[in-house]
Amino acid sequence: MAAVVFTVVVIVASSGCMDRLGAGLSPGRRRGPPRIDKHAQTFFRGVADHGAVMNPTAQPSDPGTPSLAVPPLFAALAPARSILIAGAGGGFDVYAGLPLAFALWRGGAQVHLASLSFSELELIDREAWVAEHVAAVQPDTASPDWYFPERTLARWLAAQQLPSTVYAFPPLGVQPLRAAYRHLVEHLDVDAVVLVDGGTDVLLRGDESDLGTPVEDITSLAAVAALEVPVKLVTSLGFGIDAYDGVNHVQVLENLAALDRDGGYLGALSIPGSSREAALYRDAVADAQAATPDRPSIVQGQIAAATSGAFGDVRFSRRTRGGDLFVNPLMAIYFTVDLDKLAARCLYLDHIENTIGRRQVITRIQAFRDELLSARVPRAFPH
């Protein structure tokens, strides 16, 4: 999104500048460099003051410098040998990482999937547990629980002849969840972790007008932040969906801008609707909806609809009856940030650091909000 806005500004301003430059040049004086009038000088100075490099020849040649030609998300993951993509918010959040996983698998990367599970994991086969609080869910993992997104995904992956183990964690506090992640990192020799949020509440710092449903997202963020892993990222898919839970998305954009200034924003990356990754993702979501018809994922349903070009109040489940959805192309865009820089900006991460259980996390977040002297005022989009 930031790249699109910047491009529009440059095109419009350049067009206006060229009109003025053309008017001030006579045919016999076009060989030398054009004279820029005071209006153009003011524009370029203003852009430069905001950190943009206006002279292409002055751009640094450091190979680590981000380039429009290579999405920073993939550039950051390129050196990794073993990548763990984990659903930060629980339930079907891991599905939001599938388009990324498909692209990485296609490129030959070793990718593992994990999920903070809302299923009754205590009922699954004992042999599925590979460590305390870590279950390796396979297509044939037995459980009487009808709501089991991890097994549903494992079965779908197996049908596509893709790696079909989905690691699952029960809802926990920060300390045991960190231990579970640490086991996976060591067991799988992971050198890159990507937390994926279906929605945007993982990007909130705590002083916004509303935090949405942050418990699982922020627990995952705190758990992974303390791990020694070379690459740690957070990516959000489903911009706008959390408005249902009160999230103000102008404040989300404000947070992304602040992360950009800190060097922690890796940009936005759209999932092309006609791509193989989008087609597979839609199929996986449809399969999950068929497996859990009484509780399909509203989040993944909206994202899948967005990747197919749907717009507005799209109906795909009885669960959305009576609501007013606004499916749009922004929901099919990955917004990616550096995990450590995101964690450093969270105002209440230290409040939940020593938690053991999920209930403790809920209580600590509520206490933080109760003590907050003033929240940021929500704003409407000006356009």
Residue ranges and their predicted role:
Residues 11-14, 37-38, 44, 49-50:
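Short, positively charged and aromatic/hydrophobic N-terminal segments
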Residues 55-82:
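Positively charged, low-complexity intrinsically disordered leader regions
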Residues 77-124:
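N-terminal phosphate-binding or glycine-rich loops at protein starts, especially the Walker A/P-loop
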Residues 105-106, 111-168:
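Glycine-rich nucleotide/cofactor/substrate-binding loop typically near the N-terminus or early
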Residues 126-142, 249-269:
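Acidic, Ser/Thr-rich peripheral helices and adjacent loops at domain boundaries
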Residues 164-227:
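Internal, conserved structured core segments that host functional sites
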Residues 253-318:
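A conserved mid-domain beta-alpha-beta active-site/ligand-binding segment of alpha/beta enzyme cores
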Residues 289-383:
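C-terminal accessory domains and tails appended to enzymatic cores
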